[in-house]
């Protein structure tokens, strides 16, 4: 497939336009060249953007793809009528039809989605991130009653990135604990976690993949050996079965897929959108 230039145009930071655009582009096997045009908030800047888009179209002999999130209708009109790209306007596609359906005019405020520094949702996310960092890798057993999710699994099975994703994306207070040889000898989860079993979710991973990941960190060590990884994974999975907790393999799953499964299984009450 021919490499396309993709423009992301916004009268704000452009984060929403880029997130929306990348989610759509991910459905196609292509490596687009990204051009970001944030703060396109005047007619003059819109004309500059049009000239850049049209120059790219002439230079490459193919239409650029243009994703926009423009609240200013005058600016949008300049882009719509002047550019020679394929225009995909997020507000026109989603916001304006919703205005008709809801019979309510949207705020059309620039950067409304991202301007959360004074909101309750922002505060909830910051509190969740602080909690998750304080309870990363079993650093603390305190205040576990305040946790929304407690992840357990062998070292390097994906607990920390999943915890931080849950905190940043959903405002969930996520603790995580590594399962270690002492736990395997006792053949049960860490005692401090047992009162909170309903919040516990286990992560496992194929031993071969675990050994590969650990070798990147500590090459040729017993910790990273395939034999040790097989033993740890086997013990951890047996422990999870005995405890009756829900768990999944992270081997072929993205952080987003892991987090979504956890939300579906545990159904935490406190979610930030």
Swiss-Prot record:
Domain of life from the UniProt record: Bacteria
Residues bound to ADP: 153-160
Keywords: Kinase, Nucleotide-binding, Serine/threonine-protein kinase, Transferase
InterPro entries to which the protein is assigned, alphabetical: Kinase-pyrophosphorylase (IPR005177), PSRP (IPR026530)
EC number(s) on file: 2.7.11.33, 2.7.4.28
Gene Ontology MF, one: phosphotransferase activity, phosphate group as acceptor
The reaction(s) this protein catalyses: [pyruvate, water dikinase] + ADP = [pyruvate, water dikinase]-phosphate + AMP + H(+); [pyruvate, water dikinase]-phosphate + phosphate + H(+) = [pyruvate, water dikinase] + diphosphate
Family: Belongs to the pyruvate, phosphate/water dikinase regulatory protein family. PSRP subfamily.
Function: Bifunctional serine/threonine kinase and phosphorylase involved in the regulation of the phosphoenolpyruvate synthase (PEPS) by catalyzing its phosphorylation/dephosphorylation.
Protein name: Putative phosphoenolpyruvate synthase regulatory protein
Organism for this UniProt entry: Variovorax paradoxus (strain S110)
């Amino acid at each position: 497939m021919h490499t396309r230039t993709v423009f992301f145009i916004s009268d704000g930071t452009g984060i929403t336009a880029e997130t929306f655009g990348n989610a759509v582009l991910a459905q196609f096997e292509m490596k687009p060249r990204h051009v970001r045009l944030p703060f396109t908030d005047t007619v003059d800047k819109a004309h500059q953007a049009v000239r850049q888009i049209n120059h790219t179209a002439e230079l490459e002999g193919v239409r650029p793809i243009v994703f926009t999130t423009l609240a200013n209708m005058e600016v949008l009109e300049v882009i719509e009528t002047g550019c020679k790209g394929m225009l995909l306007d997020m507000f026109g596609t989603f916001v304006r039809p919703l205005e008709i359906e809801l019979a309510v005019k949207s705020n059309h405020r620039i950067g409304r989605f991202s301007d959360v520094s004074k909101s309750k949702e922002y505060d909830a996310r910051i509190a969740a991130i602080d909690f998750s960092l304080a309870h990363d890798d079993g650093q603390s057993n305190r205040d576990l009653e305040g946790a929304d999710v407690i992840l357990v699994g062998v070292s390097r099975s994906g607990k920390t990135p999943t915890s931080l994703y849950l905190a940043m994306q959903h405002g969930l207070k996520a603790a995580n604990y590594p399962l270690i040889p002492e736990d395997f000898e006792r053949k049960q989860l860490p005692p401090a976690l047992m009162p909170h079993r309903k919040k516990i979710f286990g992560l496992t991973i194929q031993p071969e993949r675990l050994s590969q990941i650990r070798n990147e960190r500590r090459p040729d060590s017993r910790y990273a050996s395939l034999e040790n990884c097989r033993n740890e994974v086997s013990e951890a999975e047996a422990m999870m079965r005995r405890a009756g907790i829900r768990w999944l393999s992270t081997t072929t799953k993205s952080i987003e897929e892991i987090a979504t499964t956890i939300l579906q299984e545990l159904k935490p009450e406190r979610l930030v959108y």
